Amino acid sequence: ILYNKYQPFLSLSKYYGYLSLLLIVFVITQIFYEKKWINTLVKVLVVLAGVLFILHTLGLISRWYISGNAPWSNAYESIIYVAWSIMLFGLTIGRKSSLTLTAATFLTAITLASAHLNWLDPEIANLMPVLNSWWLLVHVSIIVASYGPLFLSMILGLLSLFLIIFTTKKNKKKMDINIKEL
């Protein structure tokens, strides 16, 4: 009943969205201005991203507990699982680059928001008989999770291209460092 009342993934999509907007503003500001308070604020936002990831994980665990099977039995569950894998890889890879975590947070927000479109049913359903095999379940989970790093690498590639476009003689040194981080 609490799960249905709070709708954790709809709330998380909003929180990831707000956090990604803040990260975009302050990480881009951090590239051009080296201020201590901006660095501290970015670190706080990174911690908030970790907290949201923990809540995302708890939401997946609660879906697993309620349904009695792994949460990738329909399109809605697959999308929220892909969003989880995007954030997992974003946090893992983004330890050294706040731009990577910013891109992961933005992409996670978009992915979770797309899971709540009208054509997807968030109902907790029974596992499809074809997925009843343990080996097939592991195979599907790995294949579906692999979309996370694929989407993240696409966004990071686009971000690198934008940084290259906006590189001038004045900011070449800083931009080269950020491009190498990505």
Locate predicted features.
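Polytopic transmembrane helical bundles with strong interfacial aromatic enrichment
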Residues: I1-L182
